[in-house]
Amino acid sequence: MLKYLAKRVGRSILTLFIIVTLVFCLLRLMPVEGYFANYEKMTEVQIQAGLQSMGLLDPLPVQIVRFWKDALHGDLGVSHIYKVNASVTGILAKKLPISVQMGVYAMLLSLVIGIPMGMFMGRFKSRWPDKIGTAIIVLIQAVPSAVYYLYIQMYGTTALGVGLLFDASNWKYWVLPVCSMSLGNIAFYAMWLRRYMVDESNKDYVRLARAKGVSENNIALRHIFRNAMVPLVQYIPSAFLNTVVGSIYIESLYSIPGMGGLLVTCVQRHD
């Protein structure tokens, strides 16, 4: 188990290194004006001096090595346009907590709803709980996320009596974005847990338990459910990361001052 986890962590670190390095290289293809907030008012001498001070005139391999050296020491550089000369680490420290907090709430909600839903679907295979659950999953997966995000916002704001400007101090403002973020994972957990429970229910140890006279509820909860959860657990960390990363549109939709809005703003302003 430890060897497997170490291999997964190693692959994740390598993937992260490759992606970040590629993005770093692609950003170096950005036009020169993207590095300066007042580019139109600057002379050529000032532009070259600014590029030199930022180390952008050095060879690309030198820039990559310097970037990773600074990043490993917690220095991600400074913002050139969003907040001139402000530490990127400081900016992220202000924006990241609310995105992580919202991601945690969405993950907990998806587990609380998705796991029991999948368990009931697997326990009552081909019966009405399974059919209703399957219909809900198909609906969630078939409809584009942006569509039900907008419907949740349209009707939810009226039902809860909240405005469009996010207020972190009022719990009502957390309900709609958290529900929106959790829908995809609810369908994911329910679908896969249902599948794993159906697979487990056909194994020999289940037949043996039935032959011994163990009740179906005990078999489902104490044996099938426990074993079906084992392969599902490995997806929880990646699902959480996907939830946080996928919050970009939702944060923009609800004007949440988190990583999503920050990313959109910085991309639009070429920072």
What label would you give each PLM region?
Residues L2-K3, L96-P129, S145, A168-D271:
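Alpha-helical transmembrane segments of integral membrane proteins
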Residues S12, K95, S99, A135-A142:
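Residue-level signal for discrete positions within transmembrane alpha-helices
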Residues V23, L27, P31, Y35, ...:
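Membrane-water interface at transmembrane helix exits
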Residues V23-M30, F67-K69, A135-L165, S182-G184:
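Membrane-water interface segments at the C-terminal ends of transmembrane alpha-helices
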Residues L56-I115:
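An internal, D/E-rich "acidic patch" concept
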